[in-house]
């Protein structure tokens, strides 16, 4: 998805992404194609990985681990300790990412707009955002956008700007009924990372505006994002490097077990799991 600003009418579009708040639901059925053999190793080019495992498709709590490697043929090694996370209130559903579109030839829920599921699969982590100005966040090496009051993420599937992040210029006309305010009145988006699910909104109604962000607490949930503590977010943003092509791998335990070898995922022990 594009991460460089461009002007569309009177709107400055910053990035195409995927939403973490309730939003309009697509009314037409979504075409879904199984992932093909080209997606057999969706982790192949990454040198940094976030691995999120939940108990099952409907579970909300999960565990996130960081991994890194020196080269694409090197062994993944763990970084830091386990991080408790929460996902969507309805659990996980197959998303659109590096693994392909929808399910890799297996049953399981399919992520759709407004279903309160976080996307399962493999996804690029493309950029960061937060309330603070860029010059005060020099320790973050990922592309970074300050979330001002003008910064929006369009989650209306009927909009031509669906699943895009943009700065809305004062007085500009809009073609959407729903968009997320990226500068919230709480701390949930104080720092966050964009997850490239359904890049550029190419599949209308497949889900939008998916982020890693600060959680409301261990007993909470999201509307489709993955959330964790502020301290963990600080550590993550200091660690992520764009040149390492970082990815998020997010799966229920059964799918991790089935896909670990095929996707080249690091081995974890039962003690590492939720």
Where are these regions (language model features)?
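Bacterial signal peptide processing site
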Residues: 21-23
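C-terminal motif of bacterial Sec signal peptides marking the signal peptidase cleavage site
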Residues: 17-19
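Short cysteine clusters
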Residues: 225
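Bacterial N-terminal signal peptides that target proteins for export
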Residues: 1-9
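Conserved "landmark" site that anchors the functional core of diverse proteins
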Residues: 229
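Cell wall/extracellular polymer interaction/catalysis modules
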Residues: 30-222, 232-274
């Amino acid at each position: 998805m594009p991460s460089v600003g461009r002007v569309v009418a009177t709107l400055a579009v910053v990035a195409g992404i995927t939403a973490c708040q309730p939003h309009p639901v697509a009314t037409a059925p979504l075409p879904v194609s199984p992932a093909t053999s080209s997606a057999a190793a969706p982790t192949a080019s990454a040198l940094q990985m976030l691995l999120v495992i939940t108990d099952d498709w409907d579970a909300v709590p999960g565990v996130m681990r960081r991994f890194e490697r020196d080269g694409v043929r090197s062994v993944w090694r763990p970084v830091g300790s386990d991080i408790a996370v929460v996902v969507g209130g309805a659990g996980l559903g197959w998303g659109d990412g590096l693994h392909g579109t929808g399910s890799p030839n297996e049953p399981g829920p399919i992520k759709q707009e407004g279903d309160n599921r976080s996307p399962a699969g493999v996804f690029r982590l493309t950029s960061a955002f937060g309330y603070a100005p860029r010059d005060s966040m020099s320790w973050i090496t990922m592309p970074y956008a300050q979330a001002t009051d003008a910064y929006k993420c369009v989650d209306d599937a009927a909009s031509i700007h669906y699943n895009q992040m943009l700065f809305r210029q004062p007085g500009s006309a809009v073609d959407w009924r729903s968009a997320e305010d990226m500068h919230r009145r709480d701390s949930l988006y104080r720092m966050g990372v964009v997850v490239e699910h359904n890049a550029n909104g190419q599949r209308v109604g497949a889900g939008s505006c998916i982020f890693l962000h600060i959680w409301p607490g261990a007993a909470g949930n999201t509307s489709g994002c993955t959330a964790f503590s502020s301290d963990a977010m600080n550590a993550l943003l200091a660690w992520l490097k764009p040149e390492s092509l970082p990815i998020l791998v997010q799966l229920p335990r059964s799918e991790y077990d089935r896909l670990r070898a095929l996707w080249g995922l690091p081995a974890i022990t039962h003690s590492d799991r939720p």
